[in-house]
From Swiss-Prot:
Broad class of where this protein is predominantly found: mitochondrion
Cofactor annotation: [4Fe-4S] cluster
Single Gene Ontology MF annotation: metal ion binding
Catalytic activity, reaction form: [[Fe-S] cluster scaffold protein carrying a second [4Fe-4S](2+) cluster] + N(6)-octanoyl-L-lysyl-[protein] + 2 oxidized [2Fe-2S]-[ferredoxin] + 2 S-adenosyl-L-methionine + 4 H(+) = [[Fe-S] cluster scaffold protein] + N(6)-[(R)-dihydrolipoyl]-L-lysyl-[protein] + 4 Fe(3+) + 2 hydrogen sulfide + 2 5'-deoxyadenosine + 2 L-methionine + 2 reduced [2Fe-2S]-[ferredoxin]
Pathway named in the protein's UniProt entry: Protein modification; protein lipoylation via endogenous pathway; protein N(6)-(lipoyl)lysine from octanoyl-[acyl-carrier-protein]: step 2/2
Keyword hit for Signal: no
UniProt binding sites for [4Fe-4S] cluster 2: C163, C167, C170
Transit peptide (first-last residue): 1-33
Protein name: Lipoyl synthase, mitochondrial
Cited SMART domains: Elp3
Keywords in alphabetical order: 4Fe-4S, Iron, Iron-sulfur, Metal-binding, Mitochondrion, S-adenosyl-L-methionine, Transferase, Transit peptide
Record organism: Penicillium rubens (strain ATCC 28089 / DSM 1075 / NRRL 1951 / Wisconsin 54-1255) (Penicillium chrysogenum)
Length: 416
């Protein structure tokens, strides 16, 4: 009987060591709660309420839930207040940094519509990629969220989702040795587009410097497949620079497409700091020039990002060089930093400035200019004005079908 006695003594000593004010409220062997003598498990009528914290005071002083849901602002803000940039302190205590918050005019809704989910399902089923997703485009809810597929625009990204270049503004994955091309991609792309009652489609791609032709023949084959399935479809190709090989740019231009697009991205002075070292402003100019010379009636198009630190003089010079090679369409959009690993935003350009540059571009003789904070190179590419211009040019030229046949024969011969 000595062992139980020692155990009880040990328990008694342990209880005293913890706190002399603790009281065990149940026999040994039963689970129980230990409380201090000065407190009680139940509130007495005379117990005072806990004093409100500073956090509660801030909540009570702020807007109500109904104000939060409705936005709290019934009257529109004046331009000076609407365009004002706000800052916030972020980070752990002692290491907080001041960051500029995203302006109100750059905020977009989260995509969740049924049409968005339907388009995404179709693309996944055919193993296709879109630049809308890979480049985290802020307009995806607008372009994919129409009430039906005919009002939607999806920019198909050919040749996989991995690029061989690493531009400092782009969030697309990079690798020196991306996966090989999918030989069924041109047919799958044409099949996906035929399912949607679209009148205009945009094809783009990652840069494939690992391929001899840079993927030019893959582009041409995809355009040919689409035109075979739906000749009335208007096709825009947003290509890379093919390492400056103007013959490959001309090959794509002759494939039967309607708009040849290649983005210079920024002004010439900032190109070495923004784009991959293998890309130059003059190389892009030569690509656009070769496409126009290959098919003079072809609409050529490019895009520039603002907010990277460019000056007005540099923008003027870039536009003059683009007009010198007869580029028809130019777009301006705000650069938005995809992640902290990418180059920082130098300036958030206001909508008024975008409108000013739109007017300047039109005054210089550009056929069309889309300019705004959320505008991207393929955003609303098939607007009625461009579609009407393309249809008029197509009606006035009888060479479109012959060009497609000639390019198809050239592509087949090169493949063999």
């Amino acid at each position: 009987m000595a062992a139980p006695t020692r155990s009880l003594r040990r328990l008694s000593s342990f209880r005293t060591t913890i706190s002399p004010s603790l009281t065990v409220t149940a026999p040994i062997g039963c689970r129980s709660y230990a409380t201090t003598d000065s407190s009680s498990a139940t509130n007495t009528p005379g117990t005072t309420r806990r004093r409100a914290t500073k956090f509660q005071d801030k909540l009570n002083a702020g807007p109500s839930f109904s104000d939060f849901v409705s936005g709290g602002q019934d009257e529109p803000l004046d331009p000076s207040e609407a365009y004002a940039l706000k800052t916030a302190l972020v980070g752990p205590a002692g290491r907080k940094k001041e960051m500029t918050r995203l302006p109100e005019w750059l905020k977009t809704p989260i995509p969740d519509s049924k049409n968005y989910q339907r388009l995404k399902k179709d693309l996944r089923g055919l193993n296709l990629h879109t630049v809308c997703e890979e480049a985290r485009c802020p307009n995806i809810s607008d372009c994919w969220g129409g009430s039906d597929k005919s009002s939607a625009t999806a920019t198909i990204m050919l040749m996989g989702d991995t690029c061989t270049r690493g531009c400092r503004f782009c969030s697309v994955k990079t690798s020196r040795a991306p996966p090989p091309l999918d030989p069924h991609e041109p047919e799958n792309t044409a099949e996906a587009i035929s399912r949607w009652s679209l009148g205009y489609v945009v094809l783009t791609s990652v840069d494939r410097d690992d391929l001899v032709d840079g993927g030019a023949r893959h582009f041409a084959e995809t355009v040919i497949k689409i035109k075979q399935k739906k000749p009335s479809m208007l096709v825009e190709c947003l290509t890379g620079d093919f390492r400056g090989d103007t013959e490959m740019a001309a090959l794509v231009a002759r494939s039967g497409l309607d708009v040849y697009a290649h983005n210079v991205e920024t002004v010439e002075e900032l190109t070495p700091f923004v784009r991959d070292r293998r890309a130059t402003f003059q190389q892009s100019i030569r690509v656009l020039d070769s496409a126009k010379k290959a098919v003079p009636e072809l609409v050529t198009k490019t895009s520039l990002m603002l907010g990277l630190g460019e000056t007005d003089e540099q923008l003027w010079d870039a536009l003059r060089q683009l007009r010198a090679v007869n580029v028809d369409v130019v777009t301006f959009g705000q650069y938005m930093r995809p992640t902290k690993r990418h180059m920082a935003v130098h300036e958030y350009v206001t909508p008024d400035r975008f409108e000013l540059w739109r007017q300047r571009a039109l005054d210089m003789g550009f056929l069309y200019c889309a300019s705004g904070p959320l505008v991207r190179s393929s955003y609303k590419a098939g607007e009625a004005f461009i579609e009407n211009v393309l249809k008029k040019r197509r009606a006035g030229s009888g060479t479109a079908e012959r060009t497609v046949d000639q390019t198809a024969a050239t592509t087949d011969e090169a493949t063999r």
